[in-house]
Amino acid sequence: MLILGTPGSGKSFAAKREITNVFIVTKDDIIICDPEGEYFSLVRAFNGQVIRISPTSHDYINPMDININYADDDDPLSLKSDFILSLCELVVGGKNGLEPVEKTIIDRCVRLVYQDYLADPVPEKMPILEDLYNLLRKQEEAESQRLATALEIYVNGSLKVFNHRTNVELNNRLVCFDIKDLGKQLKKLGMLIVQDQVWNRVTVNRSAHKSTRYYIDEFHLLLKEEQTAAYSVEIWKRFRKWGGIPTGITQNVKDLLASREIENIFENSDFILMLNQASGDRQILAKQLNISTHQLSYVTNSGEGEGLIFYGNTIIPFKDRFDNTLMLYALMSSKPEDVEKREKLGIKGRDDS
């Protein structure tokens, strides 16, 4: 599923409305990646779990986490290696991403770093980023030293929030990863690591015949770098195959068509909710989804909660008029006046926790 719209068109409200409906009428697990801290009140109202990841928090998620069901073939390390390559691309890669030699070195070290854990999969043997860093330092190639140096700030420096074993229990049915306080330098990395944590949850739930819903706000941030985008597209496909239901929320339609590979996300989305669109994005969507000129009028200067729904080969206009006197409306709205209303009702906000 995709939720597309300009700022202020009601994307987050639409996502929260969908999350609320799923929470009430299904038994699916729901996980949210929240880059702007917008989902706190709703999640807490449903007794969900908010995990705040920041350089100063004490909640940790380990990017090296893996389980034996991580992939659907005999080699879970292949997919994990793709993830770590994506992570290293964000940390190390310049304009052209990682060099082939660097990819080879990383892949080699990934296979080495998990040897002890896969031989005896107990929690205390799960590697952390520092173990990968130490292995890189031991390699003979000059490129490995460059990789290790780039990782150093994430292991021993001021950005070491991801150099810990996971210390939060993710057993709640509704989980929100609040990464607002990671800052610009760590946010994309945080989104990628959360996505990997969700994949681990999907693999566990598959065995229990349970669906996993994943909502990714500011989804376009994962599509900027080539390796990261390729990994995200692959995970998107695997989510659907393994009983996961991903929802990307973004204002940047152009990023969804940045390459033929990324375009597969469109082709693998049965349901697209389009709110008000910028002029250039309207033309892209019209071509991609075969939307008529008349239908485009519903996403041209449209009001909040108005637009088009694309489902299968059907396109229908909609207007969502939600009763703004309800407490649920106050929980879902991010308008300042509604935040104030929540406070008057005694509902804790993100900064009150």
Listing of model-derived features with the role each one plays in the protein:
Residues 6-8, 253-353:
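C-terminal regions of RecA-like/P-loop NTPase motor modules
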